[in-house]
Amino acid sequence: LPSDITGYSVYNSATGETVEISDAIPYPTWDEDQDIPMMRQPYGVAGWLDGDKALLVYDRYDIWSVDPAGKTKPVCLTAGEGRKTNRRFRYIKTDSEEISITPGREMLLSVFDYTDKRNGYATMTAGKATAPDIKVLDTYTFSQLRKAKNANVYAYQRANFNTSPDVWIAQNNNFRNAAKVTDAN
């Protein structure tokens, strides 16, 4: 089985060149815990920045900006915070019509803490290398997130082994003070 595919490459149809774009990321971009006899699966891609200026890829913990031409070094957009805190950050696409990610805009992230298994949400600025701003990190599972089209309002489910899945509403990324709008049992 092939075992040498360990990153991302870009094919330039105008020149016929293939460029390995993730080799300079100092950490694996594939699931290093995978122990079944098949090609290793990548952690995934968050998306492209506007104008195909960069591809955002994941390692086990963090989000990296990679130059599709391979001319500049990859930048860890989460500033290594995931690896430092043993947390996984992943981009949540909240606009179904989004084609690319606009640099400078706020990105909503899911957070998973490998140490204590807490989940939550964080935000970061697209294209800027800074530690994500944790909005909520708790012992619940957060799912079914939906964003209002023209407002900074989110609806989502929150549940754990002791509480049924209820719908909560958060305004202006204030997930810590979200309002519970259902009462499931």
Question: Where would I find each of the regions flagged by the language model?
Answer:
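Short loop/turn segments immediately following the C-termini of beta-strands
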Residues: S3-I5, R60, P68, V111-Y114, ...
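Extended catalytic-interface subdomain
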Residues: V45-G47, K53-R60, V66-P68
